[in-house]
Amino acid sequence: MADNSSDYRALFLNDVPMMDARAPVEFSKGAFPGVINLPLMNDIERQKVGTCYKQHGQDAAIQLGHQLVCGQVKDERVNAWVEFAKANPDGYLYCFRGGLRSQTVQRWLKDAGVDYPRIIGGYKAMRTFLLDTLHEAVSECDIVVLGGMTSTGKTEVLTQLRNSLDLEGIANHRGSSFGKRATGQPAQIDFENRLAIDLLKKRAAGIEQFVVEDESRLVGSCNVPLELHQTMQGCPMVWLEDSFENRVERILDDYVINLCAEFITVKGEEQGFGLFAERLLQSLNNIHKRLGGERHQRLSGLMQTALEEQQRSGTVDLHRGWIEGLLGEYYDPMYAYQREHKAARIEFAGNQVDVLDYLRERSDKR
């Protein structure tokens, strides 16, 4: 058996398999990528033990825990832990602080003939390590902000750069009012943990300059860490440009064709299309106050007609009507205003090829 570990850096850099022994309610609030939740106690058991601890102390709480997790319940949980340990012989287990729960799991595994290491300090220590990692990266690294009008292909640029931070990818959201995906977003803590691990791995590979898309503080329901977002507001910018026609086609691909396919993959043909249509109409409705009543009504009518035609014949051509209106009348004026106020920070502007070349050269000079 490997020794119990507090080398959090190595654990995350090497994607070491980890078993989380916390209760499901704790796990759902925040965990680490790829970790499996195999709890010592379920939510109700944990609550009862916690109440007992407050009222009668640690010894009584431990005794109650053993009463609640015994017999067949205990056997089933130990069997699940044994299966995990055998499938992941190089892994580790942990609880919240690396205390009684993980030590109990470790002891019961040993009773079952399996020696398995735990992480010293548990979830709390690893979470602290990742927050420190994020702080150090923001403080020590150079950051370049990639801006541009809606749907100029900023994500396409980021995915071609080894030194990018794809906040929208980590948040599973495209960033705009229309950015929700067919699958949900991670919890806030999960978002922060994934971002910190991405930074940790890239810095370990020698990257000290990062390109990040110009985002508002909120990416859907995920908050960009305040320190990072505040730093981004003063960083140099590169502005990505593309034609109006190309941007219309990109929106058609991303927010109609691909989003519809996502919903159908997740929910099935009939239910998937209905949920896709509902999502699209709701996204437009979310900005109806900013659009104004008449404009919202007109664009909503165009969208509804396009959705009906898409469902009837499979063609998506009519969607270009509301896309062109939304870009030309709403998004472009808003982004033009923003660019004017950020002009002093823009050190380069160009199309996708030119911007990629510039950012790669800029990174090489670091």
Swiss-Prot record:
Ranges for domain Rhodanese: 12-135
Keyword Transferase: yes
Organism: Pseudomonas savastanoi pv. phaseolicola (strain 1448A / Race 6)
Keyword Transferase: yes
UniProt entry keywords in alphabetical sequence: Selenium, Transferase
Active site: C95 (s-selanylcysteine intermediate)
Protein name: tRNA 2-selenouridine synthase
Family: Belongs to the SelU family.
CDD domains named in the record: RHOD_YbbB
Assembly with partners or alone: Monomer.
Function: Involved in the post-transcriptional modification of the uridine at the wobble position (U34) of tRNA(Lys), tRNA(Glu) and tRNA(Gln). Catalyzes the conversion of 2-thiouridine (S2U-RNA) to 2-selenouridine (Se2U-RNA). Acts in a two-step process involving geranylation of 2-thiouridine (S2U) to S-geranyl-2-thiouridine (geS2U) and subsequent selenation of the latter derivative to 2-selenouridine (Se2U) in the tRNA chain.
Gene Ontology molecular-function annotations: transferase activity, transferring alkyl or aryl (other than methyl) groups; tRNA 2-selenouridine synthase activity
PANTHER family: TRNA 2-SELENOURIDINE SYNTHASE
